């Protein structure tokens, strides 16, 4: 059920789905990890049951005027960890979601940077991922990830 996924203690040892995703519009940097099960996903078939994604949301560091700082590499400079979001998939997990907010068999959880449960309802996650439909397995940057995998 939504909200029941715990933050895996070892997720920082997992492969990165995508690293340093830049969100200048939100002044955020995101690190997205995927468990070893998720690495077995395919562009044609999506991600298998047992897949878990962990997304760390960092505030970008800002200057005195509130402008996001950019490093020598041209990327936003990571500041404090704001939130940790989880997305997990297993057979039947998504059935408890309200009608109109079902994202296949995915469930969601959100935590504050300090590890406490976040107040955001999972409906916000579901609403955001909804447009990605089954063809993208409700996962953002699906094509970007599989394009990166194919080019290796």
Give residue spans per PLM region.
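N-terminal low-complexity, Pro/Thr/Ser-rich intrinsically disordered segments
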Residues: 1-3
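Sequence context surrounding c-type heme c attachment/ligation sites in exported
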Residues: 5-15, 19, 23, 44, ...
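N-terminal post-signal-peptidase region of extra-cytosolic proteins
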Residues: 28-43, 67-72
């Amino acid at each position: 059920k939504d909200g029941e996924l715990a933050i895996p203690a070892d997720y920082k040892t997992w492969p990165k789905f995508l690293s340093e995703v830049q969100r200048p519009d939100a002044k955020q940097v995101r690190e997205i990890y995927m468990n070893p099960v998720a690495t077995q996903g395919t562009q044609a078939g999506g991600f298998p049951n047992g897949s878990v994604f962990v997304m760390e949301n960092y505030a970008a560091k800002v200057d005195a005027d509130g402008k996001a700082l950019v490093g020598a590499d041209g990327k936003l400079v990571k500041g404090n960890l704001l939130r940790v979001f989880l997305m997990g998939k297993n057979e039947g997990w998504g059935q408890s979601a309200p009608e109109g907010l079902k994202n296949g068999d995915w469930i969601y959880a959100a935590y504050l940077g300090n590890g406490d449960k976040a107040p955001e309802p999972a409906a916000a996650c579901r609403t955001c991922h909804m447009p990605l439909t089954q063809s993208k397995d409700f996962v953002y940057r699906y094509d970007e990830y599989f394009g990166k995998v194919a080019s290796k």
